[in-house]
Amino acid sequence: MITKEEAQKIAKLARLKFEEDTVEKFSTQLSSIMNMIDILNEIDCKDIEPLTSVSNMNARMREDEVTSSDLSDKLLDHVSGQSAQLAKEVKYFITPKVIE
């Protein structure tokens, strides 16, 4: 069982702040987690291969293709209004001021 003092020390190391009533709950939960880890450590896994994927299927790989990723012209073709021409020239979206 993790004591209240140990829980406070762990919280301090993790830079967490708890109210006094929450430290007790944290201590209990942390003790439960440590008990679960102890149970898992008792399991004999020496004859079990490490799991690298939850699925037995192999991922299909594809060849890399170099393509143009400059989509600014396509995006800016849809700009309308007074700022459309300027937006296309400077390649920026012109928006109304948001922050005063």
Swiss-Prot record:
UniProt keyword annotation of Nucleus present: no
Top EC group: ligase
HAMAP family per record: GatC
Keyword Ligase annotated: yes
EC number: 6.3.5.-
Family note: Belongs to the GatC family.
Complexes and interactors: Heterotrimer of A, B and C subunits.
Functional summary from the UniProt entry: Allows the formation of correctly charged Asn-tRNA(Asn) or Gln-tRNA(Gln) through the transamidation of misacylated Asp-tRNA(Asn) or Glu-tRNA(Gln) in organisms which lack either or both of asparaginyl-tRNA or glutaminyl-tRNA synthetases. The reaction takes place in the presence of glutamine and ATP through an activated phospho-Asp-tRNA(Asn) or phospho-Glu-tRNA(Gln).
Record keywords: ATP-binding, Ligase, Nucleotide-binding, Protein biosynthesis
GO annotation, biological process: glutaminyl-tRNAGln biosynthesis via transamidation; regulation of translational fidelity; translation
The name this protein goes by in its record: Aspartyl/glutamyl-tRNA(Asn/Gln) amidotransferase subunit C
Organism: Rickettsia canadensis (strain McKiel)
Recorded GO MF terms: asparaginyl-tRNA synthase (glutamine-hydrolyzing) activity; ATP binding; glutaminyl-tRNA synthase (glutamine-hydrolyzing) activity
Catalysed reactions, as listed in the record: L-glutamyl-tRNA(Gln) + L-glutamine + ATP + H2O = L-glutaminyl-tRNA(Gln) + L-glutamate + ADP + phosphate + H(+); L-aspartyl-tRNA(Asn) + L-glutamine + ATP + H2O = L-asparaginyl-tRNA(Asn) + L-glutamate + ADP + phosphate + 2 H(+)
